[in-house]
Amino acid sequence: MSLRKPLEATPGAFGGLDTDSPSCRPLDTVTVHVQGRARGDERCTVRVCDPDQQPYFEQELELRDNQGSLQFLAAGPLGNHYIYVTFPGESYHSRYLNFHLDCETAVESGDSDFDPLYPFTRDRMLLGRREYETPRGRFVGYISADTLHLDGIWLRDWIYGLPAYKYWELDMQCGLDRFIEAQHENGMIPDGIERNGGTWRAWVESDVEYIMTLGVWQTWKVTGDDAWMAGALPALERALAYVQRDERVWDPGHQLVKRQHSCDTWDFDIDSAGDLGGGRHVIANCDQSGYYVAFRAMGEMYAHLGRTDEAEAWTRKAEAYRQRAVELLWDGTKFLHHVHLDEIDHDGFDETGQLTMGNTWAMTRGLASPEQARSIIDEYRRRHAETGDAYPWWSLQPGYPDELGYWSAPFLKQGAYANGGLMPWVGGELCRAALLNGREDYGVELLRQWAEHLRRTGGAHVWYWPDGEPGFRTTNEVPYAGWGMGEWTAALVEGLAGITDSGGQMRTVQVNPRWAAAGVAEVRTTVRYAANRAYFAYRLRTDRRAATLRLDFTGSGEQARFAVLLPRGWQPTRVSLDERPVEFKAVSVDASVYVAFGSGIAGAQAVIIECETD
């Protein structure tokens, strides 16, 4: 016996709703198919809401033969989104359907130099990820690629890989907790922690406390864990106070950090002296850029917590520190390697001519002005052409001559390791600095060189000889140096793709796409923190015939500030956002022209930039 089914209780009474896929990425085109009700409908309204039920797309759809389709760009917060269909005469929707919005960090330009860089880096760096159960608790970190501490984590190598691992790592805080727990009573931070919980400190170094500060600051900006950050601030206060009172690392005359005589930021003295920081002091440019940005970071963290007095004090301290450092170390072309505080005779070798790795930090950390940065970049280009070395990634250029007899170890000869060897992290910082300071063409050239290096060699060692051959010093050398690959990731994501998280968790994003310098006409870029759902995504298309650019964007945040690099010879004449004109400025960075404007982030938005050409 067949049952009689009331039409009112069947799909036909409610209509049909479907999409082309149950999941998608931000700025994907979603196609919605609507089947009208059995009674027949001429139109309906389609509304799309994000996971918080906030609508970001709504359109009336005309139905023909009781069917219709439309498209929209998926946008807004990650998670399950809602599509609602409402037919005429209804006060409540007739049908609804979810689709899932998710994404990972990716660059999709169609250029074989750029697109593989991020996945290659992620896959190789994950080989150096370590997860320990120490006596104090769980520790997650990333190894040094050449250390004798095979089962330990150097703070510096780990944190200097953060510009890359912040996009995929889920557990970013526990390792920093272990370092805070191991802080000495006087405020000093250890250099590293072993699997068994033991610690070590290289006494030559004066940078560990600023690295710790940067680690907490950058991790907090990713995770958004205000309570954790506030809990770490007292430890950072003690660490930075220690630096400013210990006579081994503070020069009261110049009011700047000092260190025992070393090769820039590295952890050994000339002559392998072991006086535990008691003499042979210098003020090195590498330390000054680090403490300048660490003081700024303290100001930003206190400001976020509403502690205005502390924030302003640290901000004033940072700027005064920068001024003292620049006045002492800038030589008119570059920053000096260091200034001697104790008399050291280098037997006629002139250190003032050395171009040191710390100069790249001076540019990316803001110690150098834009004009000073361009001077340094041009000096790198000049020396690279002059030397013919494989890459301009020098630790020192030139290194200390072997005739001085400072080191007997083969890996410390001139042109090796930190005495003139080529270090990928230096190249990455130089590349990002070039992209940020009006030398975009050179930055693209460097990034393409790096891509070719990875294709040819399959990885990144800690250092190379000037001819490009990998340099070895321990049995623990592996070709996945996070302190190196991380800096090139920043050059790709923040430099070329131009996405920088200004406010933490991508609430406020600075978006400076520089694809015009690479000749890329169409690109899609997504940046996402795996530890949460913070992300930003854009599509950029350049129409050279019409002299226009179209920028579609979305994200999880609130505000975006744009400065889009224009092709050579273009000048902006009009900028519209969702077909409404917006205020803009043409900003010159040396010979480069950017068009700058701002916008809130709400759903999928489209910017059209119209230009005139020479």
Name these PLM-found stretches.
Residues 1-26:
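Short, compositionally biased P/S/T/A/G/V-rich stretches that sit at domain boundaries
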Residues 5-8, 51-53, 90-153, 173-174, ...:
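Low-complexity, Ser/Thr/Pro/Gly-enriched N-terminal "stalk/linker" regions
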Residues 34, 416, 429-614:
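Non-catalytic C-terminal accessory modules of carbohydrate-active enzymes
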Residues 51-109, 601-603:
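Extended acidic/polar, glycine-enriched regions
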Residues 113-121, 168-181, 226-246, 290, ...:
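Extended, well-ordered alpha-helical scaffold segments
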Residues 136-153, 191-211, 252-282, 332-358, ...:
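Carbohydrate-binding/catalytic loop surfaces
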Residues 151-259, 284-292, 352, 356, ...:
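Aromatic-rich carbohydrate-recognition surfaces in CAZymes
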Residues 248-257, 283-284, 290-406, 447-448, ...:
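Catalytic cores of carbohydrate-active enzymes
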